[in-house]
Amino acid sequence: MEMEIKALLVDDEEQCVKTLQDGIDWKVLGVAETFGAYNAVQAREIMKEEMISLILCDIEMPGESGLEFISSVREKADLNDENIECIILTCYPDYKFMRKAMQIGCSDYLIKPIDTDEMTAVLEKAVEKIQKKFQKDEKEKKLFPDAMKTSFSEGQQNIIDGKVIPYIQEHFSETLTVTEIA
């Protein structure tokens, strides 16, 4: 099974998003598709529909900052650093922003304007981490194929596979309760 990496580019400057989408050979890097958003609200909408593996995000945006957005995505989805690679793109070489970015699990912090070679190197590293995590997950699935299914009857597993998992995927970026899922 092959991993399809999807990247989400979040910046209130439309030209920045367009430049990133058009100026980088994403396919060569191993990224299948990119999505652009101009604020945190749009970014969340995209994340409801797509399984994003890589986020490149500006800090200063109208409404919610990029740091707040990434922090909330991680909290709501209970994600750790290995699930989604996050990279900050900003004009602010401010230590407190850098520190916060590292605290919320961002893998890098790039200052605009960004050197193409530096950007490519950072993206290659992020894609490699995503691929390694996916390969590790696939190996675990092969080693323990029935680990999750052994405690459920066939009927229960069918409900989980047919209703519960699609519901969770559809509401991935929202806070969910056991009652809502049930």
Segments predicted by a language model, with ranges:
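Conserved acidic segment of CheY-like receiver
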Residues: 4-16, 20-21, 55
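Acidic phosphotransfer microenvironment of two-component signaling modules
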Residues: 14, 38-42, 117
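Two-component/phosphorelay signaling modules centered on CheY-like receiver
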Residues: 14-35
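Short hydrophobic/Thr-rich beta-strand motif most characteristic of the beta2 strand and flanking loop
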Residues: 28-38, 46, 98
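CheY-like receiver
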Residues: 44-46, 50-161
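Basic, amphipathic alpha-helical hairpins
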Residues: 164-176
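Short alpha-helical "recognition helix" segments of helix-turn-helix
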Residues: 181-182
